[in-house]
């Protein structure tokens, strides 16, 4: 079972490279779209 992201270091990871962080600016949205194009299973953390 996964731990979620309540641990200290994981909060930093999620804030920097999580889905909502990527959606917050245009370059992040470009990253998500390129990962969707490659059909990645995970598009964000």
UniProtKB/Swiss-Prot annotation:
Spell out the InterPro entries in the cross-references: Ribosomal_bL34
Where does the record say this protein resides? Answer: Plastid, Chloroplast
Q: Does the keyword Ribonucleoprotein apply?
A: yes
- Location of region: Disordered: 1-45
- Taxonomic superkingdom: Eukaryota
Keyword Ribosomal protein on this protein? Answer: yes
Q: Could you mention a single GO BP entry for this protein? A: translation
- Major location (coarse): plastid
What's in the keyword line of the UniProt record?
Answer: Chloroplast, Plastid, Ribonucleoprotein, Ribosomal protein
Please name one Pfam family that this protein belongs to: Ribosomal_L34
Q: Which NCBIfam families match?
A: rpmH_bact (TIGR01030)
Protein family: Belongs to the bacterial ribosomal protein bL34 family.
**Name of the protein in its database record:** Large ribosomal subunit protein bL34c
Q: Which organism is it from?
A: Gracilaria tenuistipitata var. liui
């Amino acid at each position: 079972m996964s731990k979620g992201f309540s641990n200290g270091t994981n909060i930093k990871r999620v804030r920097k490279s999580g889905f909502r962080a990527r959606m917050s600016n245009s370059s992040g949205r470009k990253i998500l779209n390129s990962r969707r194009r490659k059909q990645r299973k995970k598009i964000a953390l």
